[in-house]
Amino acid sequence: MADVLTELPGVGPSTADKLIEGGYLDFMKIATATIGELTDIEGISEKAAAKMIMAARDLCDLGFKSGVELLKQRQSVWRLSTGSTELDTVLAGGIESQSVTEFAGMFGSGKTQIMHQTCVNLQIREKIFADLEGVVEEELEAPKAVYIDTEGTFRPERVVQMAEGAGIDGQTVLDNTFVARAYNSDMQMLFAEKIEDLIKGGNNIKLVIIDSLTSTFRNEFTGRGKLAERQQKLGRHMATLNKLADLYNCIVLVTNQVAAKPDAYFGVAEQAIGGHVVGHAATFRFFLRKSKGDKRVAKLYDSPHLPDSEAVFRITEKGIQD
């Protein structure tokens, strides 16, 4: 790999080794980096970083595309069932790849249950929907999930229960799910950045879950004085997640906490944590709320192309169902 990176201007074997050590394993990683990120590596100046990035972008053919090309690129998007036909319908067929989907809600609203269910559904070929003209079949073979748990709510026994409810082996699901417990925002961001290492190691990561997105940031950055720092850090984290979704055609799911909205007289009386940073970075945004018994309501309130809509689903022993 070092020999390939030496094709970039100003990159000798020593610099190539430093780039690889810093996680920049290929041209695409360098092409999508910022000058500031590359200058963090010892021995790389701003001028050298700018040259590397521009050359890598040329090699990756990054630039303007026509609307027709983008429409064709959209054919490579695949979808994963949530387990609820009604919720899948709201999403026009299921959760989209190449996007970040947020599920926000109060405790007990079903956020973590949906995350567990998607890990199971990823191992069921009938739950994956793709246009085979745009998606190579091999791309969806042996898919794996990454679950970054920030609240200690991942339960392998619940995954097994859901898998058995779906008629598949729970051990298979667990074998194909990487779990990392993040105790602070630095760990959370590091785990997200390390996902590329798993992919480079031969793991076909197709689902990335952050449960929950903002809890560590919220605990560490308290008070208005630290709000700007929190939002900047959260913005970098969201950029990493969006890049993963785009470059590797995977699904990124995040759960989010909510806060009371005192000035809300109509509609939803809570708002998701994270402000405009999360609002602009998430592709699809849902509010979840409890209903009667085991029923939950999911409201899609932000999407680039789908209308606002609601779906009712149930949380049962077998998992997410209609």
Curated annotation (Swiss-Prot):
PROSITE patterns: RECA_2, RECA_3
GO annotation (BP), single: DNA repair
Domain of life: Archaea
Record key words, sorted: ATP-binding, DNA damage, DNA recombination, DNA-binding, Nucleotide-binding
Record bears the keyword Nucleotidyltransferase: no
MF term (GO), any: ATP binding
Protein residues bound to ATP: 105-112
Database matches in InterPro entries: AAA+_ATPase, DNA_recomb/repair_Rad51_C, DNA_recomb/repair_RadA, DNA_recomb/repair_RecA-like, DNA_repair_Rad51/TF_NusA_a-hlx, Hlx-hairpin-Hlx_DNA-bd_motif, P-loop_NTPase, RecA_ATP-bd
Annotated CDD domains: archRadA (cd19515)
Family indicated by similarity: Belongs to the eukaryotic RecA-like protein family.
Function: Involved in DNA repair and in homologous recombination. Binds and assemble on single-stranded DNA to form a nucleoprotein filament. Hydrolyzes ATP in a ssDNA-dependent manner and promotes DNA strand exchange between homologous DNA molecules.
UniProt protein name: DNA repair and recombination protein RadA
